[in-house]
Design a protein with these regions (language model features):
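Hydrophobic/aromatic residues within transmembrane alpha-helices
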Residues: 32, 41, 45, 93, ...
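C-terminal-most transmembrane helix of multi-pass membrane proteins
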Residues: 2-4, 46, 128, 145-146, ...
Length: 317
């Protein structure tokens, strides 16, 4: 399948919209977790997204879906399974660790993509991208530490006893990090599939497969869900519409035109977006340490992605 004829700048302009969209996820999840188990939140998120796409997909892309080969379908099922594991792991991590720590750890995805893509996709990563990712990840670490550190006139004072972290916090951190590894695998499979199937059928099939896996997991672990307050269904619907359909669809679409590492490193903007949205909608003013971390993340993204295609002479295999 040939790439559509679009202006080369369009994918680079659309990706920031995806960052804003996915940044709403942690807030909506936190609201929902007061009433809904984490795996059920993940199941609702993927199931609602798939149902919303169903009518349009059947009307506009029914013929393409019927013509898909088993080779494409089996990778689509694998992508759906990985997406289900990613969301189940990450959303559950928010029960045990802070939003900042969870989001920062799950956005280490670019590191895993950078490590794995040369072997599984044959892509070469520009040296400047590694430098940018390092700076951005440093900013992410600072944002995570801002939850346990205080900015004082004489410097930064961290009160946490890192030698005695509770098992729940460690579990949350591990689940978020595991979600990042799984997300990297999902992105690489998506890169492979996006050259063989158009966007809407791809995301519909992946979301549907993911929803089936998550619903099965929910029924096994939690049973049939009860009725929730009306506001909870609004949060779950927004979770499906904004970060899932809009945000992740943008990233899936961009994989057809942009290097996998570029798409993955832009996901590092999510902690920044989450902090900004919390400031406006939750009246949470970020401390100076968190602002410094946000600036580093933005700087790293800019450095790692600026004129990436002109860096071919500095590629690392």
């Amino acid at each position: 399948m040939k790439k559509d004829a679009i202006h080369p700048a369009v994918p680079y302009l659309i990706v920031p919209v995806g960052i804003v969209a996915v940044s709403t996820a942690s807030l909506l999840i936190r609201f929902s977790q007061e009433y809904v188990p984490s795996i059920a939140i993940a199941a609702f998120r993927m199931g609602l997204a798939a149902l919303i796409l169903l009518p349009y997909t059947l009307i506009k892309h029914n013929r393409e879906i019927k013509s898909l080969t088993w080779d494409v379908l089996k990778f689509t099922l694998l992508a759906g399974f990985l997406l289900a594991v990613h969301f189940a792991s990450w959303i559950t991590s928010l029960e045990y660790t802070s939003v900042a720590s969870s989001v920062v750890l799950v956005t280490t995805t670019p590191l895993w993509v950078a490590l794995l893509a040369p072997f599984f996709l044959g892509e070469k990563t520009p040296r400047i991208a590694f430098i940018g990712m390092t700076i951005a990840l440093l900013g992410g670490i600072i944002i995570a530490l801002s939850d346990v550190c205080v900015w004082l006139p004489g410097g930064i004072n961290c009160q946490a006893d890192f030698g005695n972290l509770g098992s729940k916090t460690l579990l949350g951190d591990f689940l978020a990090l595991f979600g990042a590894v799984v997300a990297a695998s999902y992105l690489m499979i998506g890169k492979h599939l996006r050259n063989k199937i158009s966007l809407v059928p791809y995301i519909f099939l992946v979301f549907s497969a993911s929803a089936i896996f998550l619903v099965a997991g929910m029924l096994i672990s939690e049973g049939v869900p009860p009725l929730y307050p009306g506001k909870v269904y609004l949060w779950l619907l927004l979770l499906a519409l904004v970060p899932q359909l809009l945000g992740h669809s943008i990233f899936n679409w961009s994989l057809k035109y942009l290097p996998t590492g570029y798409v993955a490193v832009n996901l590092l903007g999510e902690p920044v977006g989450s902090t900004i949205l919390a400031y406006f909608f939750l009246n949470e003013t970020p401390p100076a340490v968190k602002i410094i971390g946000a600036i580093l993340i933005l700087a790293g993204i800019g450095l790692g992605t600026f004129r990436q295609t002109s860096q071919k002479n500095e590629e690392i295999s």
